[in-house]
Amino acid sequence: MNQIYQIPDEYFFRLHHIRPRFKSNVEEVLLYVANSISDLNTLPEKEFNEQLNAVLRNFGKNQTAEQKTIDNWRTEIAALFSFIQETETGKLFPSLMAERLAKNQYLDEFFNYFLYTFQYPAGHNKNHAVIEQIKKGIQFQPCKFILQIFQAACELSNKPFSLTAEELTQCAYFDLRVTAEHSKTAHDVAKHIIENRENKIKYSHEYEQLKKKDGNYPSAGDVYRYAGDILDYMVLANLLKTKGTHYYYYLNTDNLDLINRHLQNTAYFNQYNCFYHQKEISNAEIRALERQWFDYVNQFDNIAEFSPSLNQAEQADIAVLVQEYYAKMQGKELLPTKIFGDYGETLILAHEYLRTKGQSNRQHLINKIPTSLGVGYDLQSIEIEKHKRYIEVKSTRSKKAINSNRFKLTPNEWDSAETLGDCYFIYYLVMNETGKNIFIIQNPVKKYRENLLKIDSHLMVEFLPQAGKWQPLLEVSCSE
């Protein structure tokens, strides 16, 4: 007969957080909302919420949704994902988290910032939940701890280690020895999981503390979903990966620099510390810290490891490709130092070399343009004939394939498009686990006049399929 494991009653405490109703479509929703609100002005709370509600109402099938649903979406986006900040006078404005996502369009970067500051207790939870966690002594950063479990498992065994939401919940997430007392380390948790597997020990999710009023227990899925949420967000951040049924989570060893940055994270919101030895804590005292919590989350920026970058193989491949042309066209042996920079721009640079390969002797004119020049485009390329092609690169990177036909231009970029006409191109690079493709728009000003593009007052562009054409990104592989 199999042994059954449960957390001892004296150590059991259910950690929970807001669960977005749009979690199955979270990447698409967050990108849409970030694009839509990033240029909103600082407004009184009621007016800001009305404008955000209008944005949410226009997403997907929400036009027929009840107002309560829209309000819930707004609360989840504001609280869990920190899309809104507040001034000292109570007015609201788009947060750095929202603005950065709208500007960069990299969902994996967004989720790394999100996980970097995610903790219990925190302002993403309701005040009474924060108070309960403080009274239990909880201080827990799940992302860092989960990565420490994988790190410890590698030290304990040479076998590949995987983790399930069930194991994480039962051996760590709901155990006060982990989340509050810190007497059970990540090494202990990894050892516990490995030994339970070896001894074929099963887990029971039927805790008396979770029994419902009707006498029934919540399902296993309901019990394990909170730990599962964090594991899923870590997949979206490219820290973990899944295989097959997505039941088992593995460390994404392709991103060790990224993983190490999280492991070295010392940031922690400590404004609740004064309450841990306080007998009575009021909702008002916790509520007073909400603005500081969202300011804390949004203070982090320019973390290099979080920005998408070429891995060593990609760098080698593109370096060989570009070197070929510089050596051939200019007799130079050294690779130009400005070749590598923005992830999307570098991939498009390689694409342009491959697009013109063997068809022109002018590849030396294909170059990245320094942002400091402010010319309104990222790359100078060539046509097969004698004309030049001026390319503005817009990139979106997500785990899943998402429906996105929106990007933002600057006034300078739009002015250049008007001046350069048919020589001006927008390359909208879309990257996800299924591949990399480019939607190419030539002469966006003309497309706008033909009603194939919509552009709002903030230069947010929404394009129709007829505005351009899709092409696969041309990629080189010289290193094999």
Residue ranges and their predicted role:
Residues 1-314:
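Donor-sugar nucleotide-binding helix/loop cap in glycosyltransferases
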Residues 53-56, 206-214, 319-337:
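A short, surface-exposed helix-loop junction/capping segment
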Residues 55-56, 353-382:
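A short acidic/basic microdomain associated with nuclease active sites
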Residues 327-364:
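Acidic-basic catalytic patches of nuclease active cores, encompassing PD-(D/E)XK
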Residues 348, 352, 379-381, 389-397:
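Conserved catalytic cores of phosphodiester-cleaving nucleases, focusing on short active-site segments
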Residues 393-437:
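Catalytic cores of nucleic-acid endonucleases
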Residues 424-480:
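Domain-level recognition of nuclease-like catalytic cores that cleave nucleotide substrates
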